[in-house]
């Protein structure tokens, strides 16, 4: 049985989680922005993350984003930077997870607030411009 959940409001998603084994450690993924996944439904990205997490033999994951605005087509000029509420949620998720994997592609930069709040991140690859692959 998979435990699914999310913390969101009308326009933003702050946390999403999928946990299938509470005895194993969890991963925190930090990507660019949320898409359609919610407390019940998985989108393409969440399905990929489930596969990665199972492959790494973790018991589940939390998903946070650089920007909390839900958008199926990322447009960084619409994102609010340094959102206090989003940062607080990332800090909460960080405490629950053993590993942190970042990945936001060419559209995002490593924001100072993330550098100030999280150390020892991993990624699944590096783009030519130095950003972590999505």
Provide a role label for each language-model segment.
Residues 76-134:
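Glycine/proline-rich loop-helix segments at beta-alpha junctions forming the active-site rim
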Residues 38-41, 73, 78:
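Active-site-adjacent loop/helix micro-motif of nuclease/hydrolase catalytic cores
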Residues 35-57:
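A short mixed-secondary-structure module that forms the rim of ligand-binding clefts
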Residues 41, 45-49, 62, 86-93:
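Amphipathic alpha-helical interface surfaces
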Residues 58-75:
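Short connector loops at secondary-structure junctions
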Residues 1-43:
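Active-site and ligand/interface coordination hotspots across diverse enzymes
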């Amino acid at each position: 049985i998979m435990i699914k959940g999310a913390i969101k409001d009308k326009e933003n998603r702050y946390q999403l989680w999928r946990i299938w084994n509470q005895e194993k450690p969890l991963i925190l993924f930090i990507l660019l922005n949320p898409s359609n996944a919610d407390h019940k439904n998985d989108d393409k990205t969440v399905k990929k993350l489930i596969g990665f997490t199972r492959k790494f033999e973790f018991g589940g994951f939390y998903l946070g984003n650089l920007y909390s605005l839900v958008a199926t087509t990322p447009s960084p000029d619409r994102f609010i930077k340094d959102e206090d509420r989003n940062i607080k949620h990332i800090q909460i998720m960080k405490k629950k997870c053993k590993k942190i994997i970042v990945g936001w592609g060419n559209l995002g930069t490593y924001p100072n607030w993330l550098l100030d709040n999280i150390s020892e991140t991993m990624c699944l690859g590096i783009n030519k411009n130095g950003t972590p692959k999505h």
